[in-house]
């Protein structure tokens, strides 16, 4: 973890503890993965002799999804029952760093600086990638707690970034994706002709910073002037108490040239670069982060013609061979810029006269997911690890729009599993 070490000022009754801090062994390490060792020191500085009962270290990790009245500080007891909440635990470690000998109640630390080393191993089972969203989060932290007689406990906490690696070199993510669709422009007997669209990407899995080559063929047999466009969309889905919340937003886009009536256009690898975004999260039973590449055509006075191609944002880059020994790729250094950067909203270019007609909203749909196994009280088994360079850098600075604003849809039980 980069950055300054965690530090907490003393609040003891006599001010004997000047500071309590926590540092990791490798402060430059951006993130941790399943099975790795976390090591460091707890630092304590005392100005006078300090009596303590124990010094312990706690490491915790959990996913939570919640919304409703009780998530607001001003919620009353009568409205608290309306809130929805779900939680899944992934990490729970507790270590004793210092405790009194058997038969003794306290330890006396002499004035000065003290260091207490710690070391523990993360579970070998896949951990879900760290993430923070509007209706939930997946967070891991390490906390040192100093227990003292007659005064409140003192503690210091550090956040631990975790990534569940997704290798885009797996066969499923190397498969090309192709879709075709046609739309008749006009209505009833006043049709002006069809508009057809075919779009293809060479593989399903990409990583942050990669440029996706888009291959498309557009034929305009209508009387309208049309505009082809492409965009990457992120969809966050939260599940709590059998209800769902979904947020969908554009994270990158590109636009093509106008296509006149009776003309065609071809994209021979038109590129769309993936900005720093959190990797796909597909192995958590209460929070899911999906991506799709939409290739669509704006038709004045009509609904868009749109193709959505599934996309997985991974963490282990494409090696060009689809090698079976893809574990070697995990040794590659990753661009972790999404841990700190905020992604600006990327507006489309100013509209021309063909765009003046107001565009209807994209149809929003979440594929139905069958009911997953019961996750209460146990770690969810990862279904399909797919992920690259990330922390949820807080999701990009986009305009958050909840596509399900009413409570009606929330009452429908929905679950997801790959």
UniProtKB/Swiss-Prot annotation:
Main location: other
Topology in membrane: Peripheral membrane protein
Record's keyword annotation contains Secreted: no
InterPro entries: Arrestin-like_C, Arrestin-like_N, Arrestin_C-like, Arrestin_domain-protein, Ig_E-set
Primary role: Functions as an adapter recruiting ubiquitin-protein ligases to their specific substrates. Plays a role in endocytosis of activated G protein-coupled receptors (GPCRs). Through an ubiquitination-dependent mechanism also plays a role in the incorporation of SLC11A2 into extracellular vesicles. May play a role in glucose uptake. Participates in innate immune response by promoting IFIH1/MDA5 activation through interaction with TRIM65.
Top-level taxon of the source organism: Eukaryota
Subcellular location(s) of the protein: Early endosome; Cell membrane; Cytoplasmic vesicle
Stated name of the protein: Arrestin domain-containing protein 4
Gene3D superfamilies per record: 2.60.40.640
Name of the gene: ARRDC4
A Pfam family annotated for this UniProt entry: Arrestin_N
Subunit structure: Interacts with ADRB2. Interacts (via PPxY motifs) with ITCH, NEDD4L and WWP2. Interacts with AVPR2. Identified in a complex containing at least ARRDC4, AVPR2 and HGS. Interacts with SLC11A2; controls the incorporation of SLC11A2 into extracellular vesicles through an ubiquitination-dependent mechanism. Interacts with TRIM65.
Annotated GO CC locations: cytoplasm; early endosome; endosome; extracellular vesicle; intracellular membrane-bounded organelle; plasma membrane
Motif PPxY motif 1: chain residues: 350-353
Biological process according to GO: extracellular vesicle biogenesis; positive regulation of interferon-beta production; positive regulation of ubiquitin-protein transferase activity; protein K63-linked ubiquitination; protein transport; protein ubiquitination
Native source organism of the sequence: Homo sapiens (Human)
Similarity field: Belongs to the arrestin family.
Motif (PPxY motif 2): 395-398
Record key words, sorted: Cell membrane, Cytoplasmic vesicle, Endosome, Membrane, Repeat
Molecular function terms, GO-annotated: ubiquitin-like ligase-substrate adaptor activity
């Amino acid at each position: 973890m980069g950055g300054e070490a965690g530090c907490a000022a003393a609040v003891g009754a006599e001010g004997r503890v000047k500071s309590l801090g926590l540092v990791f062994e490798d402060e430059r390490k951006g993130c941790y993965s399943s099975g790795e060792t976390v090591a460091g020191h707890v630092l304590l500085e005392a100005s006078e002799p300090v009596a303590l009962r124990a010094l312990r270290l706690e490491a915790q990790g959990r996913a939570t999804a919640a919304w409703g009245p009780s998530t607001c500080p001003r919620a009353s007891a009568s409205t608290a029952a309306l809130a929805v909440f779900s939680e899944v635990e992934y990490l729970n470690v507790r270590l004793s760093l210092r405790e009194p000998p058997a038969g003794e109640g306290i330890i006396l630390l002499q004035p000065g600086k003290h260091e207490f080393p710690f070391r523990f191993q993360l579970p070998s089972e896949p951990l879900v990638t760290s993430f923070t969203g509007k209706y939930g989060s997946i967070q891991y932290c390490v906390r040192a707690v100093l227990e003292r007689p007659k005064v409140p406990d003192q503690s210091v906490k550090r956040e631990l970034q975790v990534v569940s690696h997704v290798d885009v070199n797996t066969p499923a993510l190397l498969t090309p994706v192709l879709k075709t669709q046609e739309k008749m422009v006009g209505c009833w007997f006043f049709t002006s002709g069809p508009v057809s669209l075919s779009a293809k990407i060479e593989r399903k899995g990409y990583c942050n910073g990669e440029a996706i080559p888009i291959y498309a063929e557009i034929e305009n047999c209508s009387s309208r002037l049309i505009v082809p466009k492409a965009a990457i969309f992120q969809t966050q889905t939260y599940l709590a108490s059998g209800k769902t919340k979904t947020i969908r937003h554009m994270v990158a886009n590109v636009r093509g040239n106008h296509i006149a009536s009776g003309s065609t256009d071809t994209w021979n690898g038109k590129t769309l670069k993936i900005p720093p975004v959190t990797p796909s999260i597909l192995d958590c039973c209460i929070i899911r982060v999906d991506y799709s590449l939409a290739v669509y055509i704006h038709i004045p006075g009509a609904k868009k013609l749109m193709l959505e191609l599934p996309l997985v944002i991974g963490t282990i880059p494409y090696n060009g061979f689809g090698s079976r020994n893809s574990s070697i790729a995990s040794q590659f250094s990753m661009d972790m810029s999404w841990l700190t950067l905020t992604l600006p909203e990327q507006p489309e270019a100013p509209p021309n006269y063909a765009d003046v007609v107001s565009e209807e909203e994209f149809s929003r749909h979440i594929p139905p997911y069958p009911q997953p196994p019961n996750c209460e009280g146990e770690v969810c088994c990862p279904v399909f690890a797919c992920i690259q360079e990330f922390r949820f850098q807080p999701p990009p600075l986009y305009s958050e729009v909840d596509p399900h604003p009413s409570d009606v849809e929330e009452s429908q039980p929905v679950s997801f599993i790959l």
